Amino acid sequence: TDAVVEATAQTIPGYTYQPLFDENGMKTVASGTVAGDGSLVLNLYYTPDADALAYHANGGQGTMAATEGVTDQVVEVAANGFERAGYAFVGWNTAADGSGQAYAAGAGYALTAGDDALFAQWTANDGTAYTVNHYKVNAAHTAATLDNAENLNATTDASVSATPQTIPGYTYQPLFDENGM
């Protein structure tokens, strides 16, 4: 008893020790004299560090501002601000490949000490337009005239193959590569 003791601040990821904290009835008491009745209580206060939730386009285009907050604060997940041609945005995920925790816009996200990031998740659109042009090449192989253009649809990034058409008096040449044609 009657010994003076001093508490040692711990390292808590995402928090900073406040040796002079004195707010709302909370006050840091880092040292004191040990009373015989065991009534000494030392209180050390740590405040949360600034933190932010970053958003990644994950194949999309554009930029989005991070959602600002502090460690352990629940922040609202932002609506998507990215674009990706031929794709529809389907939500956010903590992993780029979609294997992590999924989040929707407006959902709560608890900031953690360290990096907090969400990755846009996309699904390929069905019905993405593409065109197949069928050309007739002149006898000298120096010019070509468009005979027919097919406007077709497929899933974005799907591998497609053109089907040759029958053009009377012409033979399809699958490996034709002359004079820039």
Regions found by a protein language model. Name each.
Residues 1-181:
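Secondary-structure capping and domain/repeat boundary segments
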